[in-house]
Amino acid sequence: VSIDLFDSLPAPYGLIRYGVAPDHPRIKGIVNSLHEMLDSGKIRFFGNVLFGKDLTLEDIKRHYHAVIFATGAIKDAKLNIPGVDLDGSYGAADFVSWYDGHPDVPRTWPLTAEKVAVLGNGNVALDVARVLAKQADDMLSTDIPENVYQGLKASPVTDVHVFGRRGPADIKFTPIELRELGEVEDVEIVLYPE
């Protein structure tokens, strides 16, 4: 069996590379296992290939017996709440892509507010809050891109509040994520039952 892997990005590993917080080296360590698979010779990687432009379904069908579309989930859910489109309101997917150095997002991020509200009940919401709440220097031991480090260092953010859109029974974050957020210097976790 041989596998050809096409990606619109120049480097492989998708959301593991561009969707995991830089201070989570254990999860990012999966890249090493994937790298071994790519080096095995059974999988070939072709980067910078745009499906529909550089490669069509007809092209693929002519050369392959099976096709699997594995596109990831790098889009934000559309929130139907007032103010979601105001200046200063951003989706987590773009922010995560920025702090992970995704090549398709701007190198600078408008971190101009002192107080930030993060809406969400999942791990990504807590990752975003943790990255914003940490001192930039605490991220130096990670693989954080230099431009992101500089952006966080210059950031005026002093208060980060996480708001869940549903009740406590609907939380999606893991206890590990909550504990990691609570271990950040000067972070106080307050949970409201309603």
Predicted regions and their residues:
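General small-molecule cofactor/ligand-binding pocket signal
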Residues: 4, 44-46, 90
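Short, hinge-like loop/turn segments at secondary-structure boundaries
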Residues: 21-25, 86-87, 179-181
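Ferredoxin-type iron-sulfur electron-transfer modules and their immediate structural context
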Residues: 21-27, 69-82
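Short hydrophobic core segments
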Residues: 62-72, 117-119
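Dinucleotide-binding/catalytic capping subdomain of oxidoreductase cores
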Residues: 3-8, 12, 16, 27-30, ...
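N-terminal Rossmann-like dinucleotide/flavin-binding domain of flavoprotein oxidoreductases
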Residues: 10-66
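A short helix-to-beta-strand connector/capping loop
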Residues: 39-45, 86-87, 155-158
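Glycine-rich dinucleotide-binding loop and its adjacent helix/turn
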Residues: 76-156
